[in-house]
């Protein structure tokens, strides 16, 4: 039986294609944040509990904003950024017209993977290399994004893949789910008086 093929990314009326962070990666990171910080108000000293109760949702908004990064393609060029609701305060992102993209440069990471940078064409009359911009590799439909990038720039993207294989995030998702389940069971035990925190 043939492997199922993921549906292509949707195309807006103006021809823009958007590539958000892959759902497996985004929701795993969000769940991991919750698993790590939800117990903190209960475990903290009484004087810090109210502050932590307020800090947890603020941190969640920050993680939601960071993981909302997306890549957009249209007839003019390539853009990397965030939705309007958080772009004004994150102030991250970049954009390049297609004709300004001159090369794709790999850089090895300390974990043995490779990240890729999109390099701007060198300005006429200068000897310095063009500025480089980090290319997101955790997006949904990465293979389609690379096909579009190669078709529009003529650069070879066949060597560009994900920084980490999917099984690493699948394993992290399972471990995170187990952490959340254990915390829910512990919370239920505390609520029923079946268990008490040390020092309480």
Stretches with model-predicted labels:
Residues 42-45, 50-53, 68, 74-76, ...:
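N-terminal start-of-chain detector that recognizes signal peptides
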Residues 69, 80-147, 160-163:
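Non-transmembrane, membrane-adjacent beta-strand/coil modules in membrane-associated proteins
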Residues 49-52, 57-59, 73-76, 81-84, ...:
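A short linear-motif detector with a strong N-terminal bias
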Residues 3-6, 64-71, 99-103:
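Short small/polar-residue motifs
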Residues 25-28, 41-57, 199-200:
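Hydrophobic alpha-helical transmembrane segments
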Residues 18-22, 52-72:
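Short N-terminal secondary-structure initiator segments
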Residues 61-80, 191-200:
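Transmembrane-cytosolic junction motif
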Residues 1-44, 130-131, 144-151, 155-184, ...:
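N-terminal membrane-targeting/pre-transmembrane regions
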């Amino acid at each position: 039986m043939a492997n199922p093929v993921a549906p292509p990314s949707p195309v807006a009326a103006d021809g823009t294609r958007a590539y958000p962070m892959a759902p497996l990666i985004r929701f795993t990171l969000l769940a991991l944040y919750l698993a790590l910080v939800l117990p903190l108000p209960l475990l903290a000293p009484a004087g810090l509990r109210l502050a932590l109760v307020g800090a947890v949702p603020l941190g969640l908004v920050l993680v939601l904003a960071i993981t909302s990064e997306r890549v957009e393609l249209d007839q003019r060029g390539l853009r990397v950024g965030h939705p309007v609701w958080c772009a004004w305060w994150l102030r991250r992102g970049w954009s390049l017209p297609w004709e300004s993209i001159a090369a794709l440069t790999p850089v090895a990471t300390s974990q043995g993977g490779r990240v890729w940078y999109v390099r701007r064409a060198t300005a006429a009359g200068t000897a310095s290399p063009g500025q480089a911009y980090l290319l997101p590799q955790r997006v949904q439909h990465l293979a389609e994004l690379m096909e579009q990038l190669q078709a529009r720039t003529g650069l070879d993207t066949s060597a560009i893949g994900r920084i980490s294989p999917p099984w690493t995030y699948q394993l992290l998702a399972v471990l995170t789910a187990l952490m959340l389940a254990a915390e829910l069971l512990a919370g239920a035990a505390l609520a029923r008086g079946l268990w008490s925190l040390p020092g309480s």
